């Protein structure tokens, strides 16, 4: 029965991770809240979260595999051009998008760990929601980058600067990068695509490091639970990414901002108040 209980927890948390990791709603906020409600907050829980993040990352790789391989010079046919100009998304765009957060993350690693608490997550949810609204309301009327291949190196770097906000637990990496993309003149769809592609090296590096640190807590007995969480996160993230890229063509990010405000109230009510 104990195993079945853990498998149910793995299925629920894997679903939460897969659904929220790439939406601008903060996967951290959801994982803290749901993990607390399920009573799953020990060292095993931290290791479990690292494992299921790999499932979410794999989903992005599956969706964008042709473009991702193309960025490193491995081509499987022609990648469709997305944009109105003659440019192409290059590896340089990804590197420029990574540099700011990597540097700040290394310099302020200990300080970031110190603010990993519900109260700071609540504040991050609110501020991130405000940034989403700002991105929608202050963005240029006509995007300067209609498609991801129109992205300039400067825009990629500026989006990377916005990504630094995601070092604040609960802010949402996708929320920060998508909002930043809107503000620097990238269309909703292109900003979302770039956010997903940028997530692969950023999340993979951080996850592998966390996994190495979690090795003492890994046990063969936990393999079924971790496998269930991994597969669930992968499948749900795959569906969430495809669904999100479709609906974002028709709706704004305002509903996501409102949802963040509601979630902040729930976090305060359940975990703080």
Swiss-Prot record:
Compartments where located: Cell inner membrane
GO molecular function: undecaprenyl-diphosphatase activity
Main location: membrane
EC number: 3.6.1.27
Top-level lineage group: Bacteria
Keyword Ubl conjugation: no
Catalysed reactions, semicolon-separated: di-trans,octa-cis-undecaprenyl diphosphate + H2O = di-trans,octa-cis-undecaprenyl phosphate + phosphate + H(+)
Membrane topology label: Multi-pass membrane protein
Membrane-spanning residues: 18-40, 45-65, 92-112, 114-134, 151-171, 189-209, 225-245, 253-273
Keyword set includes Cell inner membrane: yes
Cellular compartments per GO CC: plasma membrane
Keyword annotations of the record: Antibiotic resistance, Cell inner membrane, Cell membrane, Cell shape, Cell wall biogenesis/degradation, Hydrolase, Membrane, Peptidoglycan synthesis, Transmembrane, Transmembrane helix
GO BP term (any one): cell wall organization
Top EC class of this enzyme: hydrolase
Additional facts recorded: Bacitracin is thought to be involved in the inhibition of peptidoglycan synthesis by sequestering undecaprenyl diphosphate, thereby reducing the pool of lipid carrier available.
Stored NCBIfam families: PRK00281.1-1, PRK00281.1-2, PRK00281.1-4, undec_PP_bacA
Recorded family membership: Belongs to the UppP family.
UniProt function note: Catalyzes the dephosphorylation of undecaprenyl diphosphate (UPP). Confers resistance to bacitracin.
Descriptive protein name: Undecaprenyl-diphosphatase
């Amino acid at each position: 029965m104990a195993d079945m209980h853990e498998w149910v927890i793995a299925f629920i948390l894997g679903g939460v991770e897969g659904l929220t990791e790439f939406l601008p709603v903060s996967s951290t906020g959801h994982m803290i809240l749901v993990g607390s409600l399920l009573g799953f907050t020990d060292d095993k829980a931290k290791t479990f979260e690292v494992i299921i993040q790999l499932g979410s990352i794999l989903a992005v790789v599956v969706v964008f595999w042709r473009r991702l391989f193309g960025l490193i010079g491995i081509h499987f046919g022609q990648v469709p051009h997305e944009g109105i100009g003659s440019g192409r998304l290059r590896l340089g765009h990804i590197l420029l998008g990574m540099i700011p957060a990597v540097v700040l993350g290394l310099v302020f690693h200990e300080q970031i760990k110190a603010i990993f608490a519900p109260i700071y997550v609540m504040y991050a949810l609110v501020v991130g929601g405000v940034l989403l609204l700002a991105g929608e309301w202050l963005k240029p009327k006509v995007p300067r980058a209609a498609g991801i291949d129109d992205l300039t190196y400067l825009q990629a770097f500026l989006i990377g600067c916005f990504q630094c906000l995601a070092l604040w637990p609960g802010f949402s990496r996708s929320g920060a990068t998508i909002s930043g993309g809107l503000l620097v003149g990238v269309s909703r769809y292109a900003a979302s695509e770039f956010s997903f592609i940028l997530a692969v090296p950023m999340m993979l590096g951080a996850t592998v490091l966390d996994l190495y640190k979690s090795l003492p807590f890994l046990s063969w007995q936990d393999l079924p639970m971790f496998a269930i969480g991994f597969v669930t996160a992968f499948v749900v993230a795959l569906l969430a990414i495809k669904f999100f890229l479709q609906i974002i063509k028709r709706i704004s990010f305002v509903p996501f901002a409102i949802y963040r405000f509601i979630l902040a109230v729930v976090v305060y009510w359940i975990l703080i108040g």
